[in-house]
Amino acid sequence: MSTQMSVFLSQEPAAPHWGDKALLSFAENGATIHLGDGHDLGAIQRAARQLDGQGIRSILLAGDNWDLESIWAFHQGYRNPKKHGTLEWVALSEQDQAELHARITSTDFTRDIINKTAEEVAPRQLATMAAEFIKSIAPQGTVTARIVKDKDLLSEGWEGIYAVGRGSERTSAMLQLDYNPTGDENAPVFACLVGKGITFDSGGYSLKPSNFMTAMKADMGGSGTITGGLGLAILRGLNKRVKLILCCAENMVSGRALKLGDIITYKNGKTVEIMNTDAEGRLVLADGLIYASEQNPELIIDCATLTGAAKNALGNDYHALMSFDDELSHQALTAANQEKEGLWPLPLADFHRGMLPSNFADLSNISSGDYSPGASTAAAFLSYFVEDYKKGWLHFDCAGTYRKSASDKWAAGATGMGVRTLARFLNEQAAK
């Protein structure tokens, strides 16, 4: 007897005995998702969660009503990091099948690497796994990568990554990956993508409470998301040179760890006083943004699980977007809307740059004053390390990367949200 369940889509309501608001009904031939009027992708994702929650481990999406977007919605809801069920679907056009495969390949990488434990994904492992993923999906010969690690970070001037990670026994690392499909080694760099890669964040000496620390294996979610975004852009045909820079460290407590009052001197000459060791993501990103600026790209994008303030403002369903470039920001928001992903703008203005005073350095790593807008001042801090911060720079504060508990649409863990937005935005900008 087959254990595979067929799942159908219907615009008709369920039979009355299932309840007048029933999303699912069951019969001898399988289950039916009742959408009513329209084609509610959220309802499909919720139904997939219900079926996974019932322990159904093999599903065929059957019937004539399934298309690319509905299959994708079901996949997103059905996927569970604890128990991977098998999912099959009806035949799609060659173009739609290629797109679905590209989405699954890229977002599954993102979700899997974020869900892994900090023991499995130390800083060097994160850099290595990201490079291996991009090499595995890019055309042969288009990707080169180097990983700068340990004391080499100091000799090359990457003081922030080294300082944040020096309290850990696991070596810090910076991935410098070059995707160049042009065949010209002197081709200009179109875009630089910078990811925060804190593989575990204890908070350092500004120690997090235990309940805030439980999800901190996912503090490298910015790196996972931006790597997946580049991967999907490549699978969709990205034809310009892009560099991926991941800033990887583990923020731990030891006799060697970063201390309050320490001062970091960055490669661009800026000095930063450490007033909170739990505001470490911006310290590693600063190195990545300096390196990105050195490449003279048209576009710089950074992704980071940077602040609790963004999550407090937007919850789990949106990433925050901040930029001084209003036109570019609008284009990114449009890309997110087209890809059906949550992205919402938060304010970023010049006065935010003045909210980081230090008595001993150019900047403090946290803002001062009552009711400080934490997400905005974190982005303002980063702006000091982008050469032309007014133009061509976008900052994503990834509030929707990871869920500590399941919801009606998502299993607990990583969501992969943002991968599609980044890919579309990159390819649209590259096509101009």
Curated annotation (Swiss-Prot):
UniProt xrefs under Pfam families: DUF3663, Peptidase_M17
Top-level taxonomy: Bacteria, Pseudomonadati, Pseudomonadota, Gammaproteobacteria, Vibrionales
InterPro entries associated with the record: Leucine_aapep/pepB (IPR011356), M17_PepB-like_N (IPR047620), Pept_M17_PepB (IPR008330), Peptidase_M17_C (IPR000819)
GO biological process: proteolysis
Gene name, Swiss-Prot/TrEMBL: pepB
Keyword Manganese: yes
Cofactor binding, note field: Binds 2 manganese ions per subunit.
Role of this protein: Probably plays an important role in intracellular peptide degradation.
EC number: 3.4.11.23
PANTHER family in the record: LEUCINE AMINOPEPTIDASE-RELATED, PEPTIDASE B
Keywords, sorted A to Z: Aminopeptidase, Cytoplasm, Hydrolase, Manganese, Metal-binding, Protease
Subunit architecture: Homohexamer.
Main enzyme class: hydrolase
Single GO cellular component term: cytoplasm
Protein name according to UniProt: Peptidase B
Positions of Mn(2+) 2 binding: 196, 201, 219, 280
Protein family per UniProt: Belongs to the peptidase M17 family.
Main location: cytoplasm
Cofactor dependency: Mn(2+)
Catalysis: reaction(s): Release of an N-terminal amino acid, Xaa, from a peptide or arylamide. Xaa is preferably Glu or Asp but may be other amino acids, including Leu, Met, His, Cys and Gln
Residues at the active site: 208, 282
UniProt xrefs under SUPFAM superfamilies: Zn-dependent exopeptidases
Subcellular compartments: Cytoplasm
A GO molecular function held by the record: manganese ion binding
Stored PROSITE patterns: CYTOSOL_AP
Binding site for Mn(2+) 1: 201, 278, 280
Alphabetical list of HAMAP family matching this protein: Aminopeptidase_M17 (MF_00504)
